[in-house]
Amino acid sequence: MPITDVSMVSQDALSLKNVMDDVLDKTIEVFEENNVPLPSRRFWTVGSPAIDCEQLVVSFVQIYLGPPGDQAGLPQRCTMPRSAVLTISISREIPVVGVNGRAPAGDKIQEGSEAAVVDAWMFMRLLNKLDQWEPGEFGLGVIATADVSGFEGGFQTTSMQVTLAVP
């Protein structure tokens, strides 16, 4: 099945795609600035990604008319900004029950958890960059929460859901 070519569409039509590219780039930048290693698999997508290896994923969840926080609660004028809801997630391998049925040692569980809390803190550091449209020029603010999911297939995922204006 051919992939649709978007190389010739208008810049306006690429607004959300450009935000997705920018969020992925800024996420990598913040982690690199703080010497926090990231998985080599890095991409953005729509919806929930499959978790089959260590990866950094930016996922498109929703877009709506209005600034961050005014999600479809009140009627909005067509001239209002648009806001996107994205999930940024990092899945990392964690210690699991061995083939012998024994749980990992407590220190190994804690060691596996350290990356998750570092990732959550880096997500909070990332917010400053996500609210900048141009260097030194701030946007309309962001709304964000970070959490950690239960393990799935030997991987644990730290995620941040963020709502930000689409410039």
Where do the language-model regions lie?
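Acidic-leaning, charged glycine-interspersed low-complexity segments
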Residues: 31-36, 54, 109-165
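Small/polar-rich, solvent-exposed N-terminal microdomains that initiate assembly or binding
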Residues: 1-78
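A generic structural signal for ordered alpha-helices
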Residues: 41, 46, 98-101, 105, ...
